Amino acid sequence: MPESATGVALNTIEVRFTGGMLALNRLLMTLQNKRMPVAGFTLGSDNDGMRATILLDCPPESALRYTALILALEDVSEAGPAEPIEMALIETSKDWREPAERSGIETHEDGGTVVASGEPQKVEAFLAALGDGVEDAVRLGPVARPEVRGGA
């Protein structure tokens, strides 16, 4: 997880927008021109448009003000706080099932690679519990927790 430069907790916001690359450019220019304290940025797309997960390194009150500015952009359909999730792909020689259960994270194995996901602090605790048993790890996050839309 990126470290906070200001000593306050990082605030995660999720922004949904349509309009392709021009809309993305407007969002990025807004982040830059308003000097928003961006600590992390993840972009994804689906059938409904694009989704950006932004980590802001500022107090919660400032994050809400920045969210209001972003929500005012013409291409933005939604913007608001999001619960972060971290993912890790791990190769380990240790048994990972018990530490995963104790840490309270979701895990499964796919082709010899352990896929772990959960709250950033819990993923960190899981990796610490594995200790030197981790042969290789790739970490992604924190990102916004996936949201189920329209049932299913």
Put a short name on every predicted segment:
Residues 1-10, 19-50, 55, 60-152:
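Long, contiguous binding/interaction regions
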